[in-house]
Amino acid sequence: MWKEFKEFAMKGNVIDLAIGVIIGGAFGKIVTSLVNDIIMPVIGRLVGKVDFSNLYINLSGQQFNSLQEAQAAGAATINYGLFLNNLINFLIIAFSIFIAIKQINKLKNFTKKKEEVQVEATEKDCPYCCTKIDIKATRCPHCTSVLEEATN
């Protein structure tokens, strides 16, 4: 059983997935910091010194000075400021992944086209029986017709 697990864990796809998850987690933290510490304070400053993470709708009817006070008191709140932060966070990550995948696909298509250009024909059609034959053949192995000229 240990041997099977070891073979499974050492396959390239599993290791690639693990590396992707680790890098993705780190990337997510960087983007979250970018949104919370750089982008949202600038946007908040532009729209009148608003801290978006502190924007909420109080559903309890009581008065609170901040979201933290409302949550500490157990009040029901709609935290639309945190939602906006998370939405911007998601959009940045989604756009970054879109750009990365677009570049990877472009690279794959470039190498695929390069490989297609290098492929040379190795077969031709017999003009008499229309079967595929070797391009260097001087006689068709199927219908035994003599071919005029071997093309290279």
From Swiss-Prot:
GO terms for molecular function: mechanosensitive monoatomic ion channel activity. It comes from the Bacteria. It is found in: Cell membrane. It is a multi-pass membrane protein. The chain crosses the membrane at residues 14-34, 81-101. SUPFAM superfamilies: Gated mechanosensitive channel. One of its GO terms (cellular component) is plasma membrane. Keywords: Cell membrane, Ion channel, Ion transport, Membrane, Transmembrane, Transmembrane helix, Transport. It holds the Pfam family MscL. Homopentamer. Belongs to the MscL family. Channel that opens in response to stretch forces in the membrane lipid bilayer. May participate in the regulation of osmotic pressure changes within the cell. This is Large-conductance mechanosensitive channel. It comes from Clostridium perfringens (strain 13 / Type A).
